[in-house]
Amino acid sequence: MATEISPTIIPIVMPKWGLSMKEGTVNAWLVDEGTEITVGLPILDVETDKIANAVEAPDAGTLRRKVAQAGDVLPVKALLGVLAPAEVSDAQIDDYVAAYETPADDAGEEDAAAAYQFADVDGIRVRYARKGGGAETVLFIHGFGGDLDNWLFNLDPLADAYTVVALDLPGHGQSSPRLAGTTLAQMAGFVARFMDETGIEAAHVVGHSMGGGVAAQLAVDAPQRVLSVALVSPVGFGDAVNSGYTEGFVSAQSRRELKPVVELLFADAGLVSRQMLDDLLRYKRLDGVTEALTALGQGLFGGGRQSEQPGQRLANSGKRVLVVWGGQDQIIPAAHAEAAPPGATVKVFADAGHMSQMEKANDFNALLKKHLGG
């Protein structure tokens, strides 16, 4: 005879990170059964075809059951574990687990296709993602050789309170390979026209690496379009840069050549997956991409130095500024964070590299939410 299923049971399910995620692999549990869990505590590691990340507790409670085990490959929304108070019996949990049915990932590919949109800006086809429906917009700008998926762990956590938009810059991702220019000012101007085309009057602008330089330049050149600025390992706060990365990224033609270059981005080189490398190589082999990246690299990092310093002009912008760095950044030295403008919030994650928005996603998201809320 089945027991009554308690309404106090809280499921832990496979999250959906990014627009195209369909399944994840359980790597390891980070807590034991019987542990008292607080909201947001990382409780298990999951790997996708992009990168690994920690699943956070959706609520507070006691971890009563680990349903998924290390090595399990499960679809989005599959049951991973159960939180429940002590008064819930093991039999009730057994019945809950047995009765749980993984919900359909509603539109799946159709949903992802709807979330990806395209705009024509100056004759350049630009792919972008838009989620949420908040009154204020948060615009994400990726770095050299990246794309909007560099923010796959950061968009959904903000979409409940904001409209979030991330674009592929010209010459990147699925946007046209034709560049809008090779200076930060030219790219910032292009982003402003992208905002015009997509109906964004003003936005909180979040930029990573080269995209951080673009965000800073936009705040300097068009302050009326920028509500606040958040920068992750940005260019523009000093002239040092590892040009071996940019040159190596452009020249790599095989997985063997690309792997050691991409590993420079992360404190944990094990995060670089075969799928990640294959996706990058597929992008690099598109007509016009190598030429675009070569021109961009020479324009911004020619001679092995950063050519522009908009970050040092942010102090006069009057904008609220967040600067985030990885202490193990091998591309742009974390010491550049010391050049952040007076009054800026500065955070250095000691155990992260150049991609702290991915490596320290949960901590980064909490920091960004606080920054956006003022």
UniProtKB/Swiss-Prot annotation:
Binds 1 lipoyl cofactor covalently. Keywords: Acetoin catabolism, Acyltransferase, Lipoyl, Transferase. It catalyses: N(6)-[(R)-dihydrolipoyl]-L-lysyl-[protein] + acetyl-CoA = N(6)-[(R)-S(8)-acetyldihydrolipoyl]-L-lysyl-[protein] + CoA. Pathway: Ketone degradation; acetoin degradation. The keyword Protease does not apply. Its cofactor is (R)-lipoate. The modification N6-lipoyllysine is found at K50. One of its GO terms (biological process) is acetoin catabolic process. Residues 9-84 form the Lipoyl-binding domain. Induction: By growth on acetoin. Its EC number is 2.3.1.12. Pfam families: Abhydrolase_1, Biotin_lipoyl. InterPro entries: 2-oxoA_DH_lipoyl-BS, AB_hydrolase_1, AB_hydrolase_fold, Biotin_lipoyl, Single_hybrid_motif. One of its GO terms (molecular function) is dihydrolipoyllysine-residue acetyltransferase activity. The keyword Transferase applies. Residues 137-360 form the AB hydrolase-1 domain. Dihydrolipoamide acetyltransferase involved in acetoin catabolism. PANTHER family: ALPHA_BETA-HYDROLASES SUPERFAMILY PROTEIN (PTHR43689:SF8), HYDROLASE (PTHR43689). This is Dihydrolipoyllysine-residue acetyltransferase component of acetoin cleaving system. It comes from Cupriavidus necator (strain ATCC 17699 / DSM 428 / KCTC 22496 / NCIMB 10442 / H16 / Stanier 337) (Ralstonia eutropha). The gene is acoC.
